[in-house]
Design a protein with these regions (language model features):
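A general structural signal for well-ordered alpha-helical segments in protein cores
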Residues: 23, 37, 41, 54, ...
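Acidic, metal-binding active-site segment of PIN/NYN-like and related structure-specific nucleases
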Residues: 100, 104-134
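Histidine- and aromatic-rich ligand-binding microenvironments
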Residues: 7, 37, 94-96, 117-118
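A generic structural signal for short hydrophobic patches within well-formed alpha-helices
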Residues: 11-12, 41-44, 78, 121
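Active-site neighborhoods of divalent-metal-dependent phosphate/nucleic-acid chemistry enzymes
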Residues: 2, 46, 68-114
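Short, well-structured N-terminal submotif of metal-dependent ribonuclease cores
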Residues: 1-36, 46-63, 90
């Protein structure tokens, strides 16, 4: 069974109801296939702070993510981070810090990253990436 780690931008699209692609995929996946991670939590909670009523936005994020399995940045992810960052630096293809942390968590836990930002994630060696925006 393929398990997915949705990047922050995929959740934002879902929360704003702007696209049906993410919603359609989520409707056909079992709850056990969809996961989250501490970095995505941090980014979504930070984004909630930008709204007029941040408490309401945080509640929406919690209702959405709390039922999902959560992966933290642990030692296995740290090892993947070190290898990936070294390879990216050597190739001159740096990606954003949070994206690399998310990618490392996905690699450590055999997850496929779902993101609208596939160009950046596809630079990470060995990472499986899908774009559900269409």
């Amino acid at each position: 069974m393929i398990r997915y780690l949705l990047d922050t931008n995929a959740w934002i699209v879902y929360l704003k109801g702007r696209q049906t692609g993410v919603r359609s995929h989520l409707e056909v996946c079992s709850r056990h296939q969809i996961t989250t991670c501490s970095i995505v939590w941090a980014e979504l909670l930070h984004g909630a702070r930008k709204y007029e009523n941040p408490t309401e936005r945080e509640s929406r994020v919690e209702r959405l993510l709390l039922p999902l399995e959560n992966f933290d940045f642990d030692l296995a992810a740290a090892r993947h981070y070190a290898v990936s960052r070294h390879a990216l630096e050597k190739a001159g293809m740096i990606i954003g810090l949070n994206d690399l942390l998310i990618a490392s968590i996905a690699l450590a836990n055999d997850l496929t990253v779902v993101s609208n930002n596939t160009d950046e994630f596809k630079r990470v060696p060995g990472l499986r990436v899908e774009d559900w925006s269409a």
